[in-house]
Amino acid sequence: MLQPKRTKFRKVHKGRNRGLAQGTDVSFGTFGLKAVGRGRLTARQIEAARRAMTRAVKRQGKIWIRVFPDKPITEKPLEVRMGKGKGNVEYWVALIQPGKVLYEMDGVPEELAREAFQLAAAKLPIKTTFVTKTVM
């Protein structure tokens, strides 16, 4: 699963997920899966969607993952009282703003790409849409 090799700090503040996204254009492939809603994707969800897409296209074409889980989320163990410091890092998330391209695909027909992205979108907790590369 995806996670940073090393970080400057082990734990981070919760923060907010506001604003609009960077990386809103399909830049590597021909087709893309773009976030319509706002939220956070865990490394497991990103991997599950990638596997669903890869199986749908039967390992042909090329897939790019445009998001990376770089924020650690901490949790305290079960039945532990409040206080006594921040919990341990349990998983990593990527913060997603509307307009962010999550995945890209190339080398497959459009119908197959749509089908694959639909299977991937079912694994994700945010609303998404299918986009194609705009030629200027």
Curated annotation (Swiss-Prot):
It comes from the Bacteria. GO terms for cellular component: cytosolic large ribosomal subunit. One of its GO terms (molecular function) is rRNA binding. Coiled coil: none annotated. The keyword Ion transport does not apply. The keyword DNA damage does not apply. Disulfide bonds: none annotated. Gene3D superfamilies: Ribosomal protein L10e/L16. Keywords: Ribonucleoprotein, Ribosomal protein, RNA-binding, rRNA-binding, tRNA-binding. Pfam families: Ribosomal_L16. InterPro entries: Ribosomal_uL16, Ribosomal_uL16_bact-type, Ribosomal_uL16_CS, Ribosomal_uL16_dom, Ribosomal_uL16_sf. One of its GO terms (biological process) is translation. Part of the 50S ribosomal subunit. HAMAP family: Ribosomal_uL16. Binds 23S rRNA and is also seen to make contacts with the A and possibly P site tRNAs. Belongs to the universal ribosomal protein uL16 family. This is Large ribosomal subunit protein uL16. It comes from Pectobacterium atrosepticum (strain SCRI 1043 / ATCC BAA-672).
